[in-house]
Amino acid sequence: MAPKRQSAILPQPKKPRPVAAPKLEDKSASPGLPKGEKEQQEAIEHIDEVQNEIDRLNEQASEEILKVEQKYNKLRQPFFQKRSELIAKIPNFWVTTFVNHPQVSALLGEEDEEALHYLTRVEVTEFEDIKSGYRIDFYFDENPYFENKVLSKEFHLNESGDPSSKSTEIKWKSGKDLTKRSSQTQNKASRKRQHEEPESFFTWFTDHSDAGADELGEVIKDDIWPNPLQYYLVPDMDDEEGEAEDDDDDDEEEEGLEDIDEEGDEDEGEEDDDEDEGEEGEEDEGEDD
């Protein structure tokens, strides 16, 4: 597996909300305040003033970083477009990429993978000012699961700083709604399989309960989208495990052969010792005669 490359898009630093500093009691005005406490109070007031300056610089830095990111986000667009055109020439690129990603693959059931075989293009678009949100678009070929050609999910940050999301309504074909996966079989084995089956990947499009903690959206935007090739090229873990097992079997066979050879050498050594003892006995008998 090739080493993971550094993401071309660094996660957008979250601008801290300005928090009003607590009002400090003016104890310096108390004439009876002990000298030590008075010095501590003055130090706290000065620390508060310095901290306000630090916060002001942090806010200024965030604004300048945002401008730089906006500039380079525009410069990257032609390359993203060119990359999408090249990816379109590779069958099953995106489903392979998702299956090879450890976090995304944990959300995929067998039917999800089948549906994602019709996924031809993925695009992540950050809004003009970046900090207000982004959109992820999934483009599909004609498929037996739903009518939509494009499924999208948007993430917004409103003026108050509260995150929200909205998405395309999936127009499922009859009996193909993967978000309502169920089985009519009531035997224990079937129920066990149902329990182990992960929730459908497509429920992500209907889940808007906590947009600020949407891990899948963040993974696609900040990890997969900057460099999907690194996950497409990840070797199949099943093949790796199979090769490792074969290597272990070969090692065990070699060790077994070595043990057999060693036992054979020991047996030959014992036979030689017996022959030597026999010859010595014959010589002793001859001397006695």
Swiss-Prot record:
Give me the stretches of Acidic residues compositional bias.
236-289
**What SUPFAM superfamilies does the entry give?**
NAP-like
User: Glycyl lysine isopeptide (Lys-Gly) (interchain with G-Cter in ubiquitin): where is this cross-link?
Assistant: K153
Q: Which residues carry this modification: Phosphotyrosine?
A: Y145
Describe PTMs of this protein.
Answer: Some glutamate residues are glycylated by TTLL8. This modification occurs exclusively on glutamate residues and results in a glycine chain on the gamma-carboxyl group.
Subcellular location per UniProt equals:
Cytoplasm, Cytosol; Endoplasmic reticulum; Nucleus, Nucleoplasm
Q: Name the job this protein performs.
A: Multitasking protein, involved in apoptosis, transcription, nucleosome assembly and histone chaperoning. Isoform 2 anti-apoptotic activity is mediated by inhibition of the GZMA-activated DNase, NME1. In the course of cytotoxic T-lymphocyte (CTL)-induced apoptosis, GZMA cleaves SET, disrupting its binding to NME1 and releasing NME1 inhibition. Isoform 1 and isoform 2 are potent inhibitors of protein phosphatase 2A.
Family statement drawn from the similarity comment of this UniProt entry: Belongs to the nucleosome assembly protein (NAP) family.
Q: What's the name of the protein?
A: Protein SET
Q: What is the lineage of its organism?
A: Eukaryota, Metazoa, Chordata, Craniata, Vertebrata
Gene for this protein? Set
